[in-house]
């Protein structure tokens, strides 16, 4: 139901029968955490930063975050770990100077004395993070089922955003994830207050084009690339 968008878009470029039918997390929910001695993003010049991979979207995120402080690609070192948990462990072990982390690992790091230098959403709000992707062949045979799934998803987002449901949502997520309730509460508030979940079911062409452009920066997609090939006619709802 929920997946990062980079890999499916790469697959579509290689003619895989996939389509993006909804955005889920419409902006990147990462935070950049650093050792206690590092107080500002500008201090990361020449430092070692843990990212997801050499062609992972987190590389674009970090480059966007460092650019306003005058730090260009090549002026910091990178080490790669695909999982947020691994990047958090490297930071806490002192193996790296900074790491890009998802909730609740950013909260764990802050509690341990590490500094949050910034949120990715403040530097790249136009880049969507995750969405709903379907196999076109399956969708063609199961249209009514797909529509019910998408309808249920839209209702679940509305339910999540209703403050009356906070306690129940936290309890459900704590039970499912086996994460401490306190950490789930922080994560819930982060996602709810930041309006990270797309509430309308409409995919922004601007956001989709921005993600394609970012992937082209990484050399992942050809130029030109028609974003219309990413969507499913009659199912994907596109807006500006």
Go through each PLM region and give its residues.
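Short, glycine-/small- and polar/acidic-enriched structural segments
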Residues: 1-74, 78-90, 97-103, 116-120, ...
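Secondary-structure end/capping motifs
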Residues: 140-221
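Phosphate-coordinating loops and pocket residues in cytosolic domains that bind phosphorylated ligands
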Residues: 46, 111, 232
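Conserved C-terminal helix/tail region of periplasmic/extracytoplasmic solute-binding proteins
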Residues: 209-240
